[in-house]
């Protein structure tokens, strides 16, 4: 039975994360870029000003809402995960250094896609029965499109619930236990025989922490992520920058390999990666999977932002993709490529390749810091996806389902800490990809609303849009 499930999942997974899906995601990104006048490039300095500038300002959000900074930290908590460490390594190993170039291209278009998703999520958000601000793809489908499109909202939510237990929880907990075990093995603190009991204890502790944070509501989630995300991002960036600075002489050659490898991978990898298409596919898919542009999930967190300016919050979407892919993923790639570690091109690789880049530069002691970074990345992802799952289950069954879901979601951490999750990861990845379909359809149909809101905002330099009139116009105009 399991073998049948695995085969069916492989077929669906290869299609969802294959060429047709990537063409759709890139195509929608191009459409939005053209329709907004490539706002992610044209207004990039302004985007950094209104995002980084606002982060330094302390402010309080209304009840049931987050500050704009807490919203972007919650979105980044889910986005910046172990994939930034393991996924980039895998892309380079299979697609060669040129995969990094295509990762940048996907991020460039993804900035506009996520900008549009966030803008729509804030524009169409609403208060739920508990008084919390809620939004995301299911809400901009419900509030922005006519009734015959509303099935897409339920489809997105159903796929979201099925995804969170694997992608957002169990596999992340498994990463935490693996990272801790590996670090402690090096210092003979635990043995491989005692690891299973130790992992069970970790799972129970994590389950308690997850429940404590999620059951505390949106305010507590925001308070945790606004402290955890900057800490983990700065720690990882500083460690990676150290590797780059120590190996500075290698950087020109690395960038040369990235550019040449993007169009002639066999010349850089000695024939191990002979396909231009493979390099492009791995880079684009890694970029999409890392920054989640096109999935719509990040907009769920941004919809909680207490703001009346959807476009202004949308600029946080540009900032989010920039930090996740252009900064963190690029630094991971540089750690691997400039440190001199041996890359087995054409063979699968993961976090161990990135960790080798750090240890070859700093020495074995850095394994403790990389373990801490991996744990922070994974735990923040668990919290971010916990919010996404709560919003999806709430859309399907109402607010009464929130607390039972949070309890079950927390307990799944124990499963993740103690079991082999190979098939679960693959199935969760498939459902994750299935979330793209209803979201991209909605973003495509509502692209005119994004253009209108952008024109209003830029014309008034931040004047708030008239919510009621825009919503009614959207429903009259877009199918």
What residues fall within each predicted segment?
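Alpha-helical membrane segments and immediately flanking helix-loop junctions
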Residues: 59-94, 120-143, 155-161, 273-322
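Helix-loop-helix module between adjacent transmembrane segments
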Residues: 31-33, 106-131, 138, 142-174, ...
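Transmembrane helix-loop junctions in multi-pass membrane proteins
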Residues: 4-5, 35-40, 83-88, 166-176, ...
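Flexible loop linkers connecting adjacent transmembrane helices
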Residues: 38-66, 90-100, 104, 112-147, ...
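Membrane-interface loop-to-helix entry segments
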Residues: 24-31, 35-48, 173-180, 197-247, ...
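Extracellular/periplasmic helix-exit of transmembrane alpha-helices
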Residues: 115-125, 129, 241-257, 265-271, ...
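N-terminal alpha-helical transmembrane segments of multi-pass membrane transport
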Residues: 1-82, 92-99, 110, 245, ...
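Membrane-interface alpha-helices at helix entry/exit sites of multi-pass transporters
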Residues: 59-65, 96-105, 143-155, 188-197, ...
């Amino acid at each position: 039975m399991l073998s049948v499930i695995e085969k069916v999942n492989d077929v669906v997974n290869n299609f969802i994360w294959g060429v047709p899906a990537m063409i759709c995601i890139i195509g929608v990104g191009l459409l939005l870029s053209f329709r907004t006048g490539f706002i992610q490039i044209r207004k990039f300095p302004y985007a950094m000003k209104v995002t980084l500038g606002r982060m330094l300002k302390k402010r309080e959000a209304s009840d049931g809402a987050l500050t704009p900074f807490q919203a972007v930290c919650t979105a980044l908590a889910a986005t910046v995960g172990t994939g930034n460490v393991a996924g980039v390594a895998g892309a380079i190993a299979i697609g060669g250094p040129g995969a990094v170039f295509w990762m940048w291209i996907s991020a460039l278009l993804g900035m506009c896609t996520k900008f549009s998703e966030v803008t729509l999520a804030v524009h169409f958000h609403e208060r739920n029965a508990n008084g919390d601000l809620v939004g995301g793809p299911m809400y901009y489908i419900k509030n922005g499109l006519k009734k015959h499109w509303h099935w897409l909202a339920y489809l997105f939510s159903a796929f979201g619930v099925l995804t969170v237990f694997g992608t957002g929880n169990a596999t992340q907990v498994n990463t935490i236990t693996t990272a801790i075990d590996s670090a402690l093995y090096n210092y003979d603190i635990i043995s491989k025989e005692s690891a299973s009991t130790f992992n069970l204890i970790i799972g129970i502790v994590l389950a308690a922490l997850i429940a404590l944070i999620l059951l505390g509501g949106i305010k507590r989630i925001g308070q945790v992520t606004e402290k955890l995300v900057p800490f983990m991002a700065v720690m990882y960036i500083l460690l990676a920058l150290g590797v780059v600075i120590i190996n500075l002489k290698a950087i020109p050659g690395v960038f040369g390999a990235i550019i040449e490898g993007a169009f002639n991978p066999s010349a850089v990898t000695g024939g191990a990666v002979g396909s231009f298409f493979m390099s492009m596919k791995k880079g684009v898919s890694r970029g999409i999977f890392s920054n989640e542009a096109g999935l719509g999930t990040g907009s769920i967190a941004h919809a909680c932002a207490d703001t009346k300016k959807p476009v202004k919050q949308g600029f946080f979407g540009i900032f989010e993709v920039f930090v996740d892919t252009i900064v963190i993923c690029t630094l991971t790639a540089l750690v691997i490529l400039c440190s001199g570690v041996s890359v087995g091109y054409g063979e699968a690789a993961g976090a161990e390749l990135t960790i080798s880049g750090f240890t070859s530069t700093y020495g074995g002691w850095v394994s403790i810091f990389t373990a801490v970074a991996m744990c922070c990345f994974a735990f923040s992802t668990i919290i971010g996806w916990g919010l996404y799952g709560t919003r999806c289950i709430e859309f399907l069954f109402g607010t009464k389902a929130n607390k039972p879901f949070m309890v079950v979601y927390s307990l799944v951490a124990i499963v993740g800490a103690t079991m082999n999750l190979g098939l679960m990861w693959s199935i969760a990845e498939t459902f994750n990809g299935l979330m793209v379909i209803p979201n991209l359809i909605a973003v495509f149909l509502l692209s005119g609303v994004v253009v209108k809101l952008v024109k209003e905002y830029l014309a008034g330099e931040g004047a708030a849009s008239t919510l009621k009139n825009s919503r009614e116009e959207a429903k009259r105009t877009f199918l």
